[in-house]
């Protein structure tokens, strides 16, 4: 994989959180960012990212709706998705909907970095 950087699509309406994730992973991945659910779906369909980091609570289309659409899309159905949520009760619903992993907010840079590495390794 020399010279190839996996693409991570970061979907969150909070610019500070997108930046935290990007800085945590900088130098090891290429990035695209979306600030709402519809933009996330559009970019996912266009870019076919290696991993999506997806916030549950976003404008225009929430994370569960985005996740359901990704799982229905033949080209994106197997794309690993890490769901971010501040609501512990959302964890089970996200996993049932096809999330690869669910992370509770707040999390540290090391935690998101490790989760991204692990999920990508599991995917393959």
Predicted features and spans:
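Short amphipathic alpha-helix used as the core "switch/output" element in two-component signaling
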Residues: 42, 64-77
């Amino acid at each position: 994989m020399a010279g190839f950087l996996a693409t991570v699509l970061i979907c969150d309406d909070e610019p500070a959180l997108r930046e935290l994730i990007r800085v945590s992973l900088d130098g090891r991945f290429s990035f695209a960012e979306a600030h709402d659910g519809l933009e996330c779906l559009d970019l996912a369909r266009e870019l076919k990212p290696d991993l999506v980091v997806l916030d549950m609570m976003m404008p225009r289309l929430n994370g569960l709706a985005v996740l359901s659409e990704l799982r229905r899309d033949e080209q994106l159905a197997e794309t690993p998705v890490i769901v971010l949520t501040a609501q512990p009760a959302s964890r089970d619903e996200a996993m049932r909907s096809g999330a690869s992993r669910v992370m509770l907010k707040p999390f540290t840079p090391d935690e998101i970095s490790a989760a991204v590495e692990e999920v990508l390794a599991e995917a393959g």
